[in-house]
């Protein structure tokens, strides 16, 4: 009997039959089906420092309009596609989020545009 045939036959067993097979193998060979390696891995993982996930989504927050408010409003309109009134309200209501959940590259590009227009910006 090949191993493949044996595996297929075991696959046909019911859960009760599989449980009985495990018990019989444990008794016959004097082994335990309990996972030994899992306890070792869990203990090793507990000693490690917590893993910090790298942030993948960023928000660009306008913290202040600065001296050249008109240029900042123009930049906000270009970035967001908002109308003049909406862009002005966003700039006047600083601190406000200009763009949410964007890539790091896009966030840095937008922050640079707003800073070049005279605004104070924060990337979160």
UniProtKB/Swiss-Prot annotation:
Entries under Pfam families matching the protein: Ribosomal_L12, Ribosomal_L12_N
Top-level taxon of origin: Bacteria
UniProt cross-references to SUPFAM superfamilies, sorted A to Z: ClpS-like, Ribosomal protein L7/12, oligomerisation (N-terminal) domain
GO process terms (BP): translation
A GO term from the CC aspect: ribonucleoprotein complex
Signal peptide boundaries: none
InterPro entries: Ribosomal_bL12 (IPR000206), Ribosomal_bL12_C (IPR013823), Ribosomal_bL12_C/ClpS-like (IPR014719), Ribosomal_bL12_oligo (IPR008932), Ribosomal_bL12_oligo_N_sf (IPR036235)
GO molecular function, one term: mRNA binding
Keywords, alphabetical: Ribonucleoprotein, Ribosomal protein
The keyword Ribosomal protein is assigned to this record: yes
NCBIfam families, A to Z: L12 (TIGR00855)
Entry function: Forms part of the ribosomal stalk which helps the ribosome interact with GTP-bound translation factors. Is thus essential for accurate translation.
Subunit structure: Homodimer. Part of the ribosomal stalk of the 50S ribosomal subunit. Forms a multimeric L10(L12)X complex, where L10 forms an elongated spine to which 2 to 4 L12 dimers bind in a sequential fashion. Binds GTP-bound translation factors.
HAMAP family: Ribosomal_bL12 (MF_00368)
UniProt family annotation: Belongs to the bacterial ribosomal protein bL12 family.
Protein name, entry field: Large ribosomal subunit protein bL12
Organism: Pelodictyon phaeoclathratiforme (strain DSM 5477 / BU-1)
